[in-house]
């Protein structure tokens, strides 16, 4: 009751809180300025693919994962999924022409040693690590040269990298959990902005500080299948999907709309504010 305004970036959070505090709870979508992430010209994308991945990988099917190397993000499970996808790709098409960009620190103390995981799975030639902290302009390039962006987390409040990718027209693969659901599923018609994955199983965990919380898991095989479904799209289908996700991101996560919602809800809160009596502490 001590809070006068609750603005939620995640629609899932909004639906939960409004049940108890409907009068002061609003959905204010996350957003980013439109000049940070945008669709580049085909010629530029081709040039950057050659420069970053090498001439031998410029025509590869490219995926990108942008997260901290930490347990919740499931980086090792992502690599298992990628390995399964490569095996399926070789069976279906006779090659392994695909590269996964992992924008993360492979030796982060919060996560596994990803160099060792890649080595164990024997996929060294199909994983590209982007370890440096880079400017928005360079991140925009990474999203543009990718055919999909994936999030594999078992819990995600929002999932910023998938929105950034959608702003460039890159489709996403994500589990239907937390704030990711509103991104990967078009709430207007139920269609997907890439591949939305059902949760295969839930676990309930917790601590003395957080009594309980659910973790949502998708099996590696299903992530691999999702990757293949993007790979198998025709050029026409890929272009149509790219236009769809870019349009959805610009309309549903409009930066100006977010600014206006923050402004209007704060103005309303101030105008509706009622003075309350100060609390008094009495010894009994």
Regions found by a protein language model. Name each.
Residues 154:
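Aromatic "clamp/platform" in nucleotide-sugar-dependent glycosyltransferases that forms part
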Residues 38-56:
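A short helix/loop element that forms part of the nucleotide-sugar donor recognition site in Leloir-type
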Residues 2-27, 32-40, 113:
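A short, active-site helix/loop in glycosyltransferases that binds the activated sugar's phosphate group
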Residues 54-73, 79-82:
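Conserved donor-binding/catalytic core segment of Leloir-type glycosyltransferases
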Residues 171-174, 184-185, 192-196:
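Short hydrophobic beta-strand element within catalytic cores of glycosyltransferases
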Residues 111-137:
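Nucleotide-activated donor-binding/catalytic signature segment of Leloir-type glycosyltransferases, i.e.
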């Amino acid at each position: 009751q001590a809070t006068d305004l609750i603005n939620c970036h995640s629609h899932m959070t909004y639906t939960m809180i409004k049940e108890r505090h409907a009068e002061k709870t609003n959905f204010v979508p996350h957003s980013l300025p439109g000049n940070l992430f945008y669709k580049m010209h085909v010629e530029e994308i081709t040039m950057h693919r050659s420069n970053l991945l090498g001439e031998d990988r410029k025509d590869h099917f490219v995926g990108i994962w942008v997260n901290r190397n930490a347990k919740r993000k499931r980086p090792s499970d992502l690599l298992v999924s990628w390995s399964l996808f490569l095996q399926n790709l070789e069976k279906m098409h006779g090659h392994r022409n695909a590269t996964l960009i992992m924008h993360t620190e492979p030796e982060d103390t919060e996560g596994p040693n990803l160099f060792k995981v890649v080595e164990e799975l024997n996929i060294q030639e199909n994983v590209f690590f982007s370890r440096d902290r880079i400017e928005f302009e360079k991140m925009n390039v990474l999203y543009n040269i990718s055919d999909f962006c994936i999030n594999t987390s078992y819990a995600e409040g929002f999932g910023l990298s998938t929105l950034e990718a959608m702003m460039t027209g890159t489709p996403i693969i994500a589990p239907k959990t937390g704030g990711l659901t509103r991104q990967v599923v078009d709430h207007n018609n139920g269609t997907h902005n890439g591949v939305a994955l059902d949760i295969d199983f839930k676990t309930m965990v917790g601590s003395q500080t957080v009594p309980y919380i659910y973790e949502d898991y998708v099996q590696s095989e299903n992530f691999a299948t999702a990757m293949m479904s993007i790979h198998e799209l025709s050029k026409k289908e890929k272009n149509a999907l790219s236009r769809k996700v870019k349009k959805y991101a610009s309309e549903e996560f409009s930066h100006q709309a977010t600014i206006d919602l923050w402004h209007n809800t704060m103005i309303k809160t101030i105008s509706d504010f009622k003075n309350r009596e100060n609390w008094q502490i009495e010894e009994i």
